[in-house]
Amino acid sequence: MAVLEHAGYEVVVLDEAACCGRPLLSLGDREAAQAAAEQNQQLFASRQVDRVVTACASCGLTFKKEYPALLARSGALLVPVLDIHEVLAELMPELPLGTLQQRVTWHEPCHLGRGQGLAKTAQSVLRSIPGIELVEAAHPGKCCGFGGVMRIGHHRLSNAIGDARAKDLMGTEAPIVVTGCPGCRMQLAESLKRAGSDAVVLHTVQIIAMRIAEIKGSRGQGSGAGKKLAGTGKERA
């Protein structure tokens, strides 16, 4: 929210929003997922948001790829949905970030890269931070094992996949692991801790927000001034 507000967006957090429905779909409860989608559809329309912005790769994938079918009986979701990296890619040139002399590695969430095709977009956001050294792991797009309900229903397998991912990331010797999904962030933090690593796991937008907070002075309002975003993610975002 801080980054979007700094860029001039009016950010509205919709507490009444339902879950995107991804866990329900994974469990096979399509009827409940459809009800959640219709609730969100009505809410977005009633609040007159300009776009929905989400910082969760799974939510973004669900809105973009699953909602057209889930909303077949009630009409389309008539508001653009963007992952936060898509918005950041537009905003980076005007954000006051200074120079960050830091070595980081990137973990690509399955639902961001393979699901939404935004792997290059996300990495371009990181690379546009002056001074940052982005070191790729041997398998940057390998699953972390979180998998939403998989972590609950198949905990041992989820941990085993996470441990393998942690080993790969530790091979970069980067003190910071950056990812674009809260679920991946939680899984990687626990996996790295079990492996004895002191690496910190951050969401991309956290790094941007930290840099803005550290840099004194402002360039004024950005190109998003006056737009509304909804959060779960919106313009109202």
Kindly give the residue locations of the regions a language model identified.
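Iron-sulfur cluster-binding electron-transfer modules in prokaryotic oxidoreductases
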Residues: 1-237
